[in-house]
Amino acid sequence: IVPTYSARSGTGGPVATADLDRLISELLERVESESNIDGVYLSLHGAMAGESEDDPEGKVLEGIRRHVGDVPLMASMDLHGIITDKLIEGIDAISFLHTYPHIDAYETGERAAINLLKMLDGEIKNPTTGRVQIPMLARGNELITRTGKFGEAIRACQSIETSEGGIAAGVNIGNPFTDV
């Protein structure tokens, strides 16, 4: 296990191009400085946007995948993250937060790490990542995960995760402040 990079920020609009370029290049330099990488785990929020890059996480995944090749690549992600084509193409599986308000970050990271270990052990073979986009808008007060339709959708995803062949499932609502 080789920790490579950690960055954190609050909501604040698009990241300046120079700052985003530096962040991505520093992260990729650290990954590229390692050889014989067996697998990768990323803890992402998923709703970052830059002044000149709408999909920073996808760009990071492209760079990591280019370096590590065909090794298991697992992520955990906030349910406010935006699932892009680049993200789906670059990742093997994603474990999503299942709570809003967010109280399951530790458990989500644990699920992702366990799934990565199962991929490395050969217990999970050839995972497939997909996305179904549902044309809907929901008010914030309807997104509490303990109750209501959103909570029912989360519980359906948890059922998928524990079913035979299920690895990870989630409902992502995106981020209303990231207009991409």
What is the meaning of each model-derived region?
Residues 102-108, 130-139, 169-175:
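Active-site catalytic microenvironments in core metabolic enzymes, especially phosphate/sugar-handling
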Residues 92-96, 132-136, 180:
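Short acidic (Asp/Glu) and glycine-rich catalytic loops that position anionic groups and cofactors
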Residues 1-30:
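N-terminal glycine-rich anion-binding loop in soluble enzyme alpha/beta folds
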Residues 9-13, 45-50, 101, 133-142:
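Active-site-proximal beta-alpha loop/turn segments in soluble metabolic enzymes
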Residues 141-180:
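Hard-cation-handling environments
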Residues 120-148:
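Internal, active-site/partner-interface "lid" segment
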Residues 42-45, 129, 177:
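Core alpha/beta catalytic barrel or barrel-like domain that forms the active/cofactor pocket
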Residues 17-24, 32-119:
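Active-site histidine-anchored catalytic micro-motif
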